[in-house]
Amino acid sequence: MTMTDPLSDMFSRIRNANQVLHKKVTVPSSRLKVSIADLLKREGYILDYSVIDEHPGQLLVIELKYGPDKSRALVGLKRVSKPGLRVYAKSSNLPEVFGGLGIAILSTSSGLLTCSQARKKGVGGEVLAYAW
């Protein structure tokens, strides 16, 4: 059976693993998912990620990040633009998540960017998700 929204599936797996304090979560891999994991790592929401080449497909293993008192680095992850309703933002109207405490992940002509990076470059795009 095919998956309707692979990104929502990835975010749900991360949220569920994060909720029960798992150290790692495994999702089917794609270039977009690897790019999102890379962006989350650069922003400090996850520890690391790796791609495992298994047959029939590749797997993306994401190491979740917690504080010394088991506090979550990634408190929330929400899918914004969905297959049934795409959400786009102009460069002049980019979203701000929790007053700048979170990030919006945008798919732009310059690749995947956070809302602050897109503001600096002056580009808009599809708002894929919010992370805080």
UniProtKB/Swiss-Prot annotation:
Q: What InterPro entries does this protein's entry cite?
A: Ribosomal_uS8, Ribosomal_uS8_CS, Ribosomal_uS8_sf
A Gene Ontology biological process noted in the UniProt record is: translation
- One Pfam annotation reads Ribosomal_S8
Q: Write the record's keywords in alphabetical order, separated by commas.
A: Ribonucleoprotein, Ribosomal protein, RNA-binding, rRNA-binding
Signal peptide segment: none
Which domain of life does the UniProt lineage start with? Bacteria
Q: Which GO CC annotations does the UniProt entry carry?
A: ribonucleoprotein complex; ribosome
A GO MF annotation of the entry reads:
structural constituent of ribosome
Name which cysteines form disulfide bonds.
none
Listed transmembrane segments: none
**Which PANTHER family does this chain map to?**
40S RIBOSOMAL PROTEIN S15A
Instruction: Give the protein family.
Output: Belongs to the universal ribosomal protein uS8 family.
The subunit structure is: Part of the 30S ribosomal subunit. Contacts proteins S5 and S12.
NCBIfam families assigned to the protein according to its UniProt record, in alphabetical order: PRK00136.1 (NF001109)
Its biological purpose: One of the primary rRNA binding proteins, it binds directly to 16S rRNA central domain where it helps coordinate assembly of the platform of the 30S subunit.
Official protein name in the record = Small ribosomal subunit protein uS8
- Species: Tropheryma whipplei (strain Twist) (Whipple's bacillus)
Q: Which gene holds the coding sequence for this protein?
A: rpsH
